[in-house]
Every structure is written in C-alpha cells, then in structure tokens.
Amino acid sequence: MVLVLHHILIAVVQFLRRGQQVFLKPDEPPPQPCADSLQDALLSLGAVIDIAGLRQAAKDALSAVLPKVETVYTYLVDGESRLVCEDPPHELPQEGKIREAVISRKRLSCDGLGPSDLLGKPLARLVAPLAPDTQVLVIPLLDKETGTVAAVILVHCGQLSDSEEQSLQVVEKHALVALQRVQALQQRRPEAVQNTSADPSEDQKDEKGYTAHDRKILQLCGELYDLDATSLQLKVLRYLQQETQATHCCLLLVSEDNLQLSCKVIGEKVLGEEVSFPLTMGRLGQVVEDKQCIQLKDLTSDDVQQLQNMLGCELRAMLCVPVISRATDQVVALACAFNKLGGDFFTDEDERAIQHCFHYTGTVLTSTLAFQKEQKLKCECQALLQVAKNLFTHLDDVSVLLQEIITEARNLSNAEICSVFLLDQNELVAKVFDGGVVDDESYEIRIPADQGIAGHVATTGQILNIPDAYAHPLFYRGVDDSTGFRTRNILCFPIKNENQEVIGVAELVNKINGPWFSKFDEDLATAFSIYCGISIAHSLLYKKVNEAQYRSHLANEMMMYHMKVSDDEYTKLLHDGIQPVAAIDSNFANFTYTPRSLPEDDTSMAILSMLQDMNFINNYKIDCPTLARFCLMVKKGYRDPPYHNWMHAFSVSHFCYLLYKNLELSNYLEDIEIFALFISCMCHDLDHRGTNNSFQVASKSVLAALYSSEGSVMERHHFAQAIAILNTHGCNIFDHFSRKDYQRMLDLMRDIILATDLAHHLRIFKDLQKMAEVGYDRNNKQHHRLLLCLLMTSCDLSDQTKGWKTTRKIAELIYKEFFSQGDLEKAMGNRPMEMMDREKAYIPELQISFMEHIAMPIYKLLQDLFPKAAELYERVASNREHWTKVSHKFTIRGLPSNNSLDFLDEEYEVPDLDVTRAPVNGCCSLEG
C-alpha cells in the first residue's frame, strides 16, 4: 500500500507542478544533494491517509528540506472552523503576526513572535528576539477552490537559500494536496457505509475502513505517475474495461475551442495518428453541452458509423459519460465504453463505476492534459525559435526566404499545401511555391489584392480560418475542378511589418491530422507571422542596401567609361542656334527618309531641331543649354556595339518624330505623353552592352544581380541610366516642372522604356488587338498606356519600315551583335540560341520568322489605329518578300559558307529596282 501511495505522490508532484520537477526526468542532469531528501519527504506526504499521519509527514518534510528546524506546529481546521494544533493542543492566536499571515494569505517571515502571538508555554520558545541566523515562518495553506485558509504551519528554522526556498514551495503545495486527499477519504467513508453492493466482498472493509472499490481506485491512482496523457489513458482505460466488462474503452478529448473531439488511445492500442472529428455533428456534441450520459440508442447513424470506423468493429452497445473538470466545471473529455461482455447494454452500475473512477482520476487527467499542452507549447516555442533562426539566415535572398517560410509554416501546422503572397501595390504576387521558385515572370501568380480569400485577409489584416472551403463564399473552386485537387479547409493569415502594415499573406490548405485548423493553429500562425514579417522586411531592406551598392558600382563604371560633356561641346552645338528641320533635308519629315543617312556629328542638332519643331522647347520652357547638355550626355551614354548604339537611338527618336508629324498624335495623346515618348526613344537603350537579358542572368552580371528579380534587366538599366543623366548637374531638362508633372514624366518614361522588352509587348498584344477592334478611346487611360507601348515598339523596330538595302544592312549589324554574344556564351561553356550561333543561324528564315510574328503584326495594329500608317505595313511586308526571295535563292544555289554573315554578302543580294542615292552613315546606300 505504501508503494501505491508513493506512486500517487509522484503523479501529483509531476502534474500539479506542470513539469517543473527535474528529479523524476531521466534525461535531466543529476539532482542536487537535497533532491533525495526532498523526494523522500514528498513521498511521505503522499502516503498519509489520516490527520495524524499528515501532521507527522508535514513535520518530517519540513525538517528534511529546511535548515536548523527546531519546532514545527501544524494548525488544521476543526469542526467549528477553528485552526487547532494537537501537539501540544492549542488554538491559533487571534492577533499578532500569525493572524496577519492568515488574513493576507501569504507566507510571513519574522525574527520572532510578539506578546500578542504567545499563548503560554506552547509558543514561548518563539518569542523575539531569536538566535542569530534563525527565523519564524508562518505558512498558510490555501484551498484554491474556496479561497480559504485550510491549514497553517508554524516553523522555527534557519535562514533559507534559493534552493531551500524552492523546496519549501514544493512542500507547501503537496502538503495541501495531501490534506485535500485525507479530507476526501474522510468524506468517502460514510458513503461507503450507506451504499449496498450485490457483491458482499466489494463492501467488506479492511481494518482501516476501506472497501475493495476504494483499494482498486487507490491502486489505480498510485499507477498514474506518467508524464504523458497517452500512458495515463492506457491505465485508466484498462481499469474501465475491467470494471464495466467492455471490449473497448476510449477517451474522446474535447479541444479548447469546443469544436472537435480527438482520440489517441482505444483500449490497449495507441493509434499511429490521432483521430479527430467535428464536435458539431450528432449527439456527442450535445453531451458536451448537456453533461448527460448517453447510450448507443441515443446516437445518430452518422455518429455510429464514425465510431465504428474509428474502432474497426461493429457497435452492439455503448456508454458515453462526460468527464467534468472540477476547476472549470466544463467537459474536458467523453469516456466511452463499447460492447459489454455478457450483456446487450451497459447498466447504471457501469455508469457509476466510470463516474467513480474519474472522481479520483479526473484531476490527474486534466492536470496531465494541461501539462501536455504546456509541453506542446514549449516545443512549439522552441520550434518557433528554430524557425526564426532558419529565417534570419536567409535574409540575403527573398525567394529563398519565402521558400523557407513555406516549408516551416507547412511543418508547424501539419498542412498539405502552403502558399505565400507578397503585396505589390494593388496585387498579391506569388513567385514561390511548394515546388520551388519561379524564375520566369510569366509563370508567377498575380491576383487582385481585394479578391478571394487571400485578398480578404490582405485587405482586413485579420486571420481567416475556414473549416469548409467549398461552403465559403470567397472560395473559388474552379481550380479544384480543373486539377482534381480537393481543398477541404484553409487557414489564411496576414504577414505584417513593424508598422502593422500588411506586406503579404500566407495560405495554409488542408490540415493533415485533423478535420480543420484549430484555435491552436491560429495562435501558432499569429506568432509565426511575426517572425515572417520581421524577416521579410529585413530581407527587402537588405536587398535595397545591396541594390544601392550595385548602383554605386554601376555609376562608377559608367563614369569610368564615359567622359563628361565639356562646355565647349554644348557651346559649339548652340553657336548658330537651333537649325530648322527643313534645313536638314527636304524629306526629313517623310516616312521614306532614312535617318542613318545623316552624319553622326549632325545628329545632336537634329534632335534639337525635332524638339523645336514639335514645340516642346517653347511649351515647356526648356533651357536650351540644359537641353544641349542633356542631348550630348545621352549620346555619350551609348556604347559602340554594332547595332544598339547612338545611331539606333537617333533612328528610333526620328521615327517618333515622323509619327508625330504624319499621324497627328496630338489628337490621341497629351503633350506630356508625346514628350515622354520622344525622350524615352532617345534613352531607351542607354549603356547597352550588346547582350540581351538572358545573357545578363546567365552570366550573373552586376545588372542581373540588380534587376533580375524584377524582370527586363536591360530595360530597367536603361531607365536607371536616363535618371542618372537627369540627375547630373546641368542636364535636368525637367528641373522646372511641377512636382506632379515631374513625377508623371518619370513614370511615363519608366513604363515606355520597359515596353521595349518584346516579352512585355507579347504579354499585352491581346489587349492591343482588342483596343484596335473596339477603337481608340481618348478618355480611356488604359488606351493611352497601351498606345504609348505600341508606338514605342514600332519606333524601336522602325528600321524594318525602310527600303530593302537599309533593312538588309541593319540585319547584318544585328547579327554581328548576336554572334558576338553567342561567342561569349560558348566561351562560358553554354550553348547559344540558334539565332546567336554564327555556325547555325540561317538568317533569311530567322528574318522571315521575325517579320511574320513580330514586325508585321505590330505595324498592322498601327495601320488599324492610324490609316495613314498603311505605307509602313506595306514596306515591312515588301521587305519580308525580299527575305523570302533570298531564302529561295540560297536553297537553289546552296549555302555560301559556315559563317552565317556570308548570307549577307553583296553576291547574294536580291536585285533591287531602287537606285543608290547617297552613302549611308554606318549602314548602306539609300533608296528613295
């Protein structure tokens, strides 16, 4: 019996202390020297079953853990509610320091008692002053349920160390537990005398007044020393099966939010995965609310089917008894017994046996569950700390960080799928998925920030837990229908920065080990989102710092490569004033004019002439010296690759001028938009290196490091260089603009220059077609944006609208540049595209494909919107026919050599009826 009661004490120590005891854990460090004496003292307290034993055990326990104990008096409440000590018999003083401790309900320490505390000889030895290094402790023990003082212990001992103070706190708690147990046993004995039993042996008392039922339950309590709820359930369920003669018993634990039941143990079997099901279904949920027992006949067919699936056998009988917490008076579990041996149903005696069991073990069960919850929280906190460590080690790459967030969120919540969206202006963008990071912009997911579940969370900033996705009005099930995937439940939570602004949204889909995401998952997600917000914000900040460093590096590189514009240069340019357009060439404003025929030294003046002819200098009151410096600086901002050089920029700018003059753009666009288009044409290829975007990414260049995450690497660099020139002293032609106009001009330039990326053009091509079909609407802002993009692209490809000889020569320049890149790629060990491989490229077919799929559709759209642009489309179509003839000629006569540029030798030219007019600057002879 002593061993059994020792086990009782161990369980009480572990569960009421919620895992704070270290001396029972096998994986903790060895206990301190006083731990053995403390354990013996607590075991003695756990073994008491009467008042006399309690007094002695309390005295022994305090003597074991406190230093220099000389006297211990224990005062217990008697029948008249007085606090009385029996050794020697006397009542607790009604005045003085002892009474103060009782009233305040807190432990009191003093160097001795005063006259009002003394009741003759019993307390005479405690009078002040005491011997040095000694004290009197007045220790009230509080009944937590009633809030009253259940006992008072008076101790004369030495001064306490920190470890002795902790040991005293342990003894206080367990002395109170022992007292409550003794009182419960005293109350139980009269009931045992009154009750009758069918089996006389069950009511037969031993010499201490205990029945067989009492001995069984005491033995069970002695075995409940486990730290985890699973082991405890196994022992309790084994006891219930014996008492009720059931084939199976289980405990259905009620979740904190009262929304689901869970079961981990059935009879002698521990399930591999915890079984959970909603509490809102059937009669089981009513048991939690009504706190009334039910049997099999009370269940719905769905309840029966669910329980049979869980048990794996047919139900013939069932008894369900609610287990109620004494502390909260709420149902914490449902004790279920199934299929009675030798009977068709469970009796009232079985119900009383279950209730009797949990009358004594219910507190241990709730304490164990609370302890297990604390342990779970502890583990989750440790996991969150590890998550924080993992996240903060990936701040250098946002994509890798988001991938880490997805992995950690899925693992923490046991979700099947996780997605993370970042808020980008009015859109939620997902570039990182469970499968990895998406490098191609065309495959990233963009959704409006105010639509769907993620949009709702981003807008409200509140967590959203959806138990049934298909029943929720914000859920779109079209994706499920098309993929065959079934979304059962969703937990979507916001990610905020330090200013509590939403910067992203995380969406968890399908709880793996439960019917839906629980309140615990919500709390965990909320805590997790804090780490996510901090890490993402710092990662973006880190990225900005790196970008600033890259920009600084680029600025230095540009300054080293280019020379500043001297005062002599712009003075010479403006010496004779701005030349009229008509003085340049009589056909300068015609589509047939080829700008490459103009000497390069005259192009800067031609730019000024066009700006003056379009009246931008006067309308915007641009300072001519500033404009001259800007034009010269832009010209110097171009490197000298075969094609993407200043003459290309000049040709593109001239075509913009032609569109303005011949298509009357002022009837379609605002002046500031046309001005932005012209300046963008000048700057659209600034500092071009003769290589494309994919090469920058593959070579891991500085440009790729700076712009690859945003896409359009070179185009973003061109715009950045344009801004750098504007910020150069004496070059800001927009300096006198209002703040609003200045911001709009820069926004227009950014959008127009980015539109020179053909990938961007292909993305908006359907929108352009739709605009051409319905007709241009000047009041539609979207039409303005689309038209500017179309005009920029048509300017960029304007060489294809010139005569055949110009087009052929331009092809030679382009492929020289392409083949140079191909040679670099081969040197890097990469395989270049066919069009960039001088040994494989078949230029005529490549040009035909380019004409048919890119150039002709662009100028066809331009013709649909502007009938006067028909000649441009016709000339592009004519050039396409020339390439067809060249291709046919090569097919008949054979390939000239292994060098693809030999396709463009004069020998293989198609005879042209146009006669040569004049030498072309860096290009060819011109036709009319």
Swiss-Prot record:
The protein's UniProt keywords, in alphabetical order, are:
cAMP, Cell membrane, cGMP, cGMP-binding, Cytoplasm, Hydrolase, Magnesium, Membrane, Metal-binding, Mitochondrion, Mitochondrion inner membrane, Mitochondrion outer membrane, Nucleotide-binding, Phosphoprotein, Repeat, Zinc
Which residues does the record give as Mg(2+) binding sites? Answer: 685
Tissue expression pattern: Expressed in brain and liver.
Catalyzed reactions: a nucleoside 3',5'-cyclic phosphate + H2O = a nucleoside 5'-phosphate + H(+); 3',5'-cyclic GMP + H2O = GMP + H(+); 3',5'-cyclic AMP + H2O = AMP + H(+)
Family, similarity comment: Belongs to the cyclic nucleotide phosphodiesterase family. PDE2 subfamily.
**Quaternary structure?**
Homodimer.
Q: What does this protein do?
A: cGMP-activated cyclic nucleotide phosphodiesterase with a dual-specificity for the second messengers cAMP and cGMP, which are key regulators of many important physiological processes. Has a higher efficiency with cGMP compared to cAMP. Plays a role in cell growth and migration.
| Name of this chain's protein | cGMP-dependent 3',5'-cyclic phosphodiesterase
Q: What organism, scientifically named, is this protein from? A: Rattus norvegicus
Q: Which gene encodes it?
A: Pde2a
